[in-house]
Structures are given as C-alpha cells and as structure tokens.
C-alpha cells in the first residue's frame, strides 16, 4: 500500500499562537509530530505551512510545502499541497494534525489501509470509546456515529446518540450504551480533495464547525473504525502544552 502524510502547521493558532514552534523537551512541536509520522509506512512525509519560520526550523529533515495563508480549512490546504506535488487522483493522503506529537505511527498506517480497503469511501477516519460523562457532554470532544459497516452517519459536538432513558431528568448514566470520540486524523483520495474545494460550506458544517460534514452533505461516504492504539489528546491550550512538557521532560 502506498500513501503520503501531510502535516498542516499554521503559526497563527487562535488559542496558542506559534504552537508548531513550541519547545517540548528540546524539540519543537512540529519536529515531534514529523518524527512520529516518519515512523509510519508512508512513502513520504510533508509539512504544509504558510510561515517561513516553521520551514526554517525543519531545514532539510522533512520536505516542506509552502501554502497560502487564506485557506478556510485544513482540507483546502491539503488540496493545494496535492496540486503542487502533482499527485495522482487515486493517491492517498493522510492528514496528521500538527498538534499531535504523541500520535502512534500504527494509527497512521491503519487509517490509510482502511481507505485503501474501502473503494466506495473517499475519506477514512478513526475513533475511540468515550468512557466518562465529562467527555460525552464536552462540546470540544467531537462524537462519531457510524453504522455496522463502519460508514459514518454523523459527527457532532452534542452528546450523540442521546440515550433517552439513561439521560432522563438530568442523569448522565453511560452504562448500556456506546459513544465514540472522533480522532482528528483523516485519509483522503486526491480526487476527492479536488472535489471538496469546489463545494460551498454546508449548513451543518457551519453550525457544528466540523469540516467533514461538508463531505457528508454532498453524499461522500466516510469510513470510521476504532483506533488500534490509544491516541493521546492533542495540544490545544497552554495547559495541554505544560502537561506534555512535564511528561516528556526526561526524553
């Protein structure tokens, strides 16, 4: 199986400006993510950025693709990368978030293999079980709902599916149900990326602020499967960053 990995790395993060260059135990965030990706089976790893400072830090350790600053979503940025690299329509690109320095290489391989094995899907992604009510009712934890064939039915920031009886009268009983946290790693076919950028943002996409809903609104099948390994949460805030620094301080 052949696939590429692209790591989008924007300097102008809303909640944590300069996040890709944040130092984590002697290495920048973007370097740590790229090194994890290099341990996967990908044919090639690229970092996509709109900031020369990020490219300068990476030097010649990872190929860098400079992109425009005005992309409305990460998927749009990936399409520019695919175009600049002249990738074939049936090539597979895995998008690994630039704030996932602990991403297991095995899940990168997994999501690429899942897309390759499901020719009726144009996207593939992963999930993991939600085991506490704090995560289920947290709008920053995106929930995934999928059918018995692994096809996505919906993604939401709301606690879906809603357990009518267990959640009655303000209860938050998670027994007897299954809830899944969406993990923000995607595999795409290049032909789909060229389609995606032609579509206007969908109503549900704008309401939930979830770009995968644009694909679903246009009839695209998305494959979803539980991750083969635990995927630690990404770095969204200064608190997340400090926790990771403490965790990796001796490495």
Swiss-Prot record:
Pathway connected to this protein: Nucleotide-sugar biosynthesis; CMP-3-deoxy-D-manno-octulosonate biosynthesis; CMP-3-deoxy-D-manno-octulosonate from 3-deoxy-D-manno-octulosonate and CTP: step 1/1; Bacterial outer membrane biogenesis; lipopolysaccharide biosynthesis
Catalytic activity line of the entry: 3-deoxy-alpha-D-manno-oct-2-ulosonate + CTP = CMP-3-deoxy-beta-D-manno-octulosonate + diphosphate
Where is this protein localized, as stated in its record? Cytoplasm
Which GO BP terms apply? Answer: CMP-keto-3-deoxy-D-manno-octulosonic acid biosynthetic process; lipopolysaccharide biosynthetic process
Which keywords, in A-to-Z order, does the entry hold?
Answer: Cytoplasm, Lipopolysaccharide biosynthesis, Nucleotidyltransferase, Transferase
Q: Main localisation, per the record? A: cytoplasm
| Segments forming a coiled coil | none
The UniProt entry's GO CC annotations, sorted and at most eight, read: cytosol
Q: Which molecular-function annotation in GO is an example for this chain?
A: 3-deoxy-manno-octulosonate cytidylyltransferase activity
- From which domain of life does this come? Bacteria
Keyword Cytoplasm in record? yes
- Any idea of its EC number? 2.7.7.38
List the InterPro entries: Cytidylyl_trans, KdsB, Nucleotide-diphossugar_trans
Looking up CDD domains in the UniProt record yields: CMP-KDO-Synthetase (cd02517)
Task: Read off the PANTHER family from this record.
Answer: 3-DEOXY-MANNO-OCTULOSONATE CYTIDYLYLTRANSFERASE, 3-DEOXY-MANNO-OCTULOSONATE CYTIDYLYLTRANSFERASE, MITOCHONDRIAL
Role noted for this protein: Activates KDO (a required 8-carbon sugar) for incorporation into bacterial lipopolysaccharide in Gram-negative bacteria.
Stated family? Belongs to the KdsB family.
Q: What is this protein called?
A: 3-deoxy-manno-octulosonate cytidylyltransferase
The organism is: Alcanivorax borkumensis (strain ATCC 700651 / DSM 11573 / NCIMB 13689 / SK2)
């Amino acid at each position: 199986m052949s696939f590429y990995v692209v790591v989008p790395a924007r300097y102008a993060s809303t909640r944590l400006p300069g996040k890709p260059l944040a130092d984590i135990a002697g290495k920048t965030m973007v370097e740590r993510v790229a090194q994890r990706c290099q341990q996967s089976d990908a044919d090639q790893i690229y970092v996509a950025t709109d900031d020369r400072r990020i490219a300068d830090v990476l030097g010649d350790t990872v190929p860098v693709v400079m992109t425009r600053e005005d992309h409305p979503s990460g998927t749009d940025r990936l399409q520019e990368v695919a175009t600049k690299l002249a990738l074939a329509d049936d090539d597979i690109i895995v998008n690994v978030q630039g704030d996932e320095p602990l991403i297991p290489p095995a899940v990168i391989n997994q999501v690429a293999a899942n897309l390759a094995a499901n020719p009726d899907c144009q996207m593939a992604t992963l999930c993991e079980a939600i085991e506490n009510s704090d995560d289920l009712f947290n709008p920053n934890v995106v929930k995934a709902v999928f059918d018995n064939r692994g096809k996505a039915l919906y993604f939401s920031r709301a606690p879906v599916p809603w357990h009518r009886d267990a959640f009655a009268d303000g209860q938050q009983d998670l027994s007897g149900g299954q809830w899944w946290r969406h993990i923000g790693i995607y595999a795409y076919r290049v032909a789909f990326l060229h389609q995606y950028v032609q579509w206007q943002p969908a109503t549900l996409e704008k309401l939930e602020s979830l770009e995968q809903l644009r694909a679903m609104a246009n009839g695209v099948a998305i494959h979803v499967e539980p991750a083969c390994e635990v995927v630690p949460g990404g770095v969204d805030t200064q608190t997340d960053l400090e926790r990771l620094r403490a965790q990796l301080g001796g490495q």
